[in-house]
């Protein structure tokens, strides 16, 4: 079985995103040790995502790839099958999707670039954009080091992220990529979240939850 999420996209939408299954659990999730969780399975790897409140009246199933090598490798293997052949470079926002971009780069042999959250003293002619994060609700800086421009300029680029929700990060990344002469031709993610997005190659869909 490729992918199981607690509630998935409709079957036609899943097919467009690369396939998937869903269970009748809906937005309720389950409780483990008193913590509300949302079950997922990708490439035979199962996880229970904690449901956490991120704003007034809004909670999300929190996917954390950091330190989870087994899940990262399973996700990368599935996304690699769906990477458009025209893609030449991968770009990912710091920080949670960095392990995924690294694993996907290793499998596909495509170089990857990390858009940092802050400007660093060693950066050469950095290019930046400010977006609003759905997780924190606060402005977030996206910065490309000028030293990475050669990997993007004149290239067809795929953005790699863990979860795509409002699209504010994507908008900022698209502007950064275009500013340095690249072309964003694909967006790849583990999950979309909230409203379904047909413009994202994802392995499944996560709903938003109402805090208890």
Question: How should these model regions be labeled?
Answer:
Residues 110-157:
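Short, glycine/charge-rich flexible loops or terminal/linker lids adjacent to PRPP-binding catalytic cores
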Residues 88-94:
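Short glycine-rich phosphate-binding loop at a beta-alpha junction
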Residues 26-32, 40, 171-212:
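PRPP-dependent phosphoribosyltransferase catalytic core
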Residues 99-108, 174:
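Short Gly/Thr/Asp-enriched flexible loops that form oxyanion-binding sites at enzyme active sites
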Residues 161-174:
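Acidic, divalent-metal-coordinating active-site segment for phosphoryl/phosphodiester hydrolysis
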């Amino acid at each position: 079985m490729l992918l199981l999420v607690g509630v998935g996209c409709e079957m036609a939408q899943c097919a467009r995103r690369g396939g998937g299954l869903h269970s009748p659990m809906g937005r309720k999730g389950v409780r483990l040790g008193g913590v509300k969780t949302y079950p997922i399975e990708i490439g035979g790897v199962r996880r229970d995502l904690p449901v956490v409140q991120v704003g007034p009246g809004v909670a999300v199933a929190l996917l954390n790839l950091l330190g989870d090598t087994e899940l990262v490798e399973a996700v990368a293997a599935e996304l690699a099958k769906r990477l458009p052949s025209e893609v030449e470079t991968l770009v990912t926002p710091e920080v949670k999707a960095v392990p995924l971009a690294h694993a996907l780069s290793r499998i596909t042999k495509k170089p990857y670039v990390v858009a940092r959250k802050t400007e660093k003293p060693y950066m050469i002619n950095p290019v930046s954009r400010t977006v609003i994060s759905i997780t924190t609700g606060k402005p977030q800086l996206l910065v490309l080091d000028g030293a990475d421009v050669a990997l993007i300029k004149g290239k067809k680029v795929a953005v790699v992220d863990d979860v795509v929700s409002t699209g504010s990060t994507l908008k900022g990344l698209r502007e950064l990529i275009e500013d340095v002469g690249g072309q964003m031709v694909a967006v790849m993610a583990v999950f979309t979240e909230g409203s379904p997005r047909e413009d994202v190659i994802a392995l499944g869909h996560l709903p938003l939850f109402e805090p208890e």
